[in-house]
């Protein structure tokens, strides 16, 4: 359980809702050209492939990087980009309007995930 707490999952999930796999996504900063674009493409491919097999995922960027790096024994050259949790969905996720700049996910009364997002009008620079 201590390991799961490093991912702050104990406050979200019931015992039968814990993900079955965690993947720590790292960037090797000793290599030239390592960037967030490549990492984002890798994340998209992993999560899309999982979903094609009925496995849900959650890309987590708001994580305790120092604690997870220590837990995994990651070297100094590795930057922990994110962690992906994989599992079999028991809840639905809904996009909801972001309120007062708050991007924290929350559970509704049905224990479904509410994912705050900014409205399109705020993020589009120009429409044609």
What are these regions (language model features)?
Residues 1-128:
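Acidic, surface-exposed loops and disordered segments
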């Amino acid at each position: 359980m201590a390991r799961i707490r490093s991912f702050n999952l104990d406050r979200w999930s019931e015992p039968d809702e814990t993900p079955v796999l965690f993947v720590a996504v790292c960037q090797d900063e000793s290599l030239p050209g390592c960037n967030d674009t490549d990492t984002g493409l890798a994340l998209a491919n992993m999560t899309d492939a999982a979903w094609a097999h009925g496995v849900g995922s959650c890309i987590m960027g708001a994580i305790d990087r120092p604690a997870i790096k220590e837990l995994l024994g990651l070297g100094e050259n590795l930057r922990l980009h994110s962690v992906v949790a994989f599992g079999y969905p028991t809840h639905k996720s809904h996009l909801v309007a972001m309120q007062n700049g708050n991007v924290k996910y929350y559970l509704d009364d049905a224990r479904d995930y509410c994912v705050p997002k900014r409205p399109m009008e705020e993020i589009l620079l120009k429409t044609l």
